[in-house]
Design a protein with these regions (language model features):
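Sec/Tat signal peptide C-region and signal peptidase I cleavage site
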Residues: 20-24
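Conserved C-terminal helix/tail region of periplasmic/extracytoplasmic solute-binding proteins
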Residues: 294-333
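Pocket-lining segment of extracytoplasmic ligand-binding domains
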Residues: 87-88, 168-260
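Short, glycine-/small- and polar/acidic-enriched structural segments
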Residues: 25-166, 170-176, 180-186, 199-203, ...
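Bacterial N-terminal signal peptides
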Residues: 8-19
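Secondary-structure end/capping motifs
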Residues: 223-306
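N-terminal secretory signal peptides that target proteins for export/translocation
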Residues: 1-4
Length: 333
């Protein structure tokens, strides 16, 4: 009996000395906003659904906040990281904010400039109402580019530009007849094409370099949470690589259907093909695209101070350089 007691005491002593088995660290919770609902948000959805964020020790909550408000939420410290366009980063920086683009997920201006079925030619928009997105947002600039290309000048031609929320709201405004035209992403535009609405201009075919969306954070947050930001970026980059592998098409299409609420196979196929056709294999910010953003914002009177900025002032390429130098990008190709 004494021998058994001593054995138990010895085991307890060893357990105390060596400590209990280490428990897995709790994942870091983080809120990640996206400023639009379109197929280029898919890398975020896939990273969450396929466990890539979890792989890097993150518990990510994805939340939709319309782009301009998402940028404001970051500046207010309410949201640490978001997927928004370089237009909003430009506005923040020229107002004294410290937002910066660290990944590039959509590096071109790809919108359908849509009109109601009653509009047969662009000239018929004179004196009519056109919906734009948030002030200085990518959809707004796409509208200005489309009007320029079609030879229309809002002030001269009495075209009323109305700031109408996100894409679902602009689509709804077109259907309701409260506006005659609007810029929509191709996946939403295709819905209206099937209903008889007209594509007056496909800006994607014009190949306009443009940083439409990217992963954005404040420089102060990056400085105080470098590993969290890097892990988040790694998860998204793996999401991009997953999407671009043909073997994963069925999973990606199901995810698009669920998140975009698309149920028709032809629309899903077009959304998928557009995504894999434009999603960069190495999702880094496009310096040419950012330069184009700055130029267009000045040209259309959206932010005169943008003329004083260089692309390097609103972009941080350090993570992309690290991923390139370490072979992380190459390992996923």
């Amino acid at each position: 009996m004494k021998l058994q007691t001593r054995a138990v005491i010895f085991v307890v002593y060893l357990f105390t000395l060596l400590g209990a088995p280490a428990q897995a660290a709790e994942p870091t919770k983080i809120l990640l906003a996206h400023g639009a609902i379109n197929n280029f948000v898919e890398p975020l959805w896939i990273a969450k659904e396929q466990g890539f964020f979890k792989k890097y020790g993150l518990d990510v909550d994805l939340i939709f906040i319309i782009a301009g408000r998402a940028a404001q939420a970051m500046l207010a410290g309410q949201v640490p990281v978001a997927m928004v366009g370089a237009t909003h980063v430009t506005n923040a920086v020229t107002a004294g904010g410290d937002l910066t683009v660290i990944l590039g997920l959509q590096n071109s201006l790809n919108y359908f400039f849509m009109a109601r079925p009653s509009i047969k030619r662009a000239e018929e928009l004179k004196g009519k109402k056109v919906a734009i997105g948030t002030p200085s947002g990518s959809a707004s600039l796409a509208t200005y580019v489309a009007l320029d290309y079609l030879g229309l000048i809002p002030r001269r031609d009495n075209i009323v530009l109305l700031g109408i929320g996100g894409e679902p709201e602009r689509l709804g405004a077109l259907r309701a007849g409260s506006v005659e035209a609007a810029s929509l992403s191709p996946e939403f535009g295709q819905i209206l094409v099937s209903e008889g609405y007209r594509v007056l201009l496909d800006t994607g075919k014009e190949k306009v370099p443009f940083q439409s969306s990217g992963l954005v954070a404040s420089r102060s947050y990056i400085k105080s949470n470098p590993q969290t930001v890097e892990n988040l970026a790694r998860g998204i980059v793996e999401g991009v690589a997953f999407i671009l592998k043909p073997a994963n098409k069925e999973i990606v299409v199901r995810s698009l259907a669920r998140n975009l609420r698309l149920d028709k196979p032809d629309r899903l196929e077009k959304a998928y093909l557009q995504l894999i056709g434009e999603l960069p294999k190495k999702p880094c910010p496009s310096m040419e695209g950012v330069a184009s953003v700055l130029k267009l914002m000045v040209q259309h009177g959206l932010n005169a101070k943008a003329a004083q900025l260089k692309p390097e002032e609103i972009v941080d390429m350090s993570l992309c350089k690290k991923f390139e130098d370490s072979g992380f990008f190459k390992s996923l190709l």
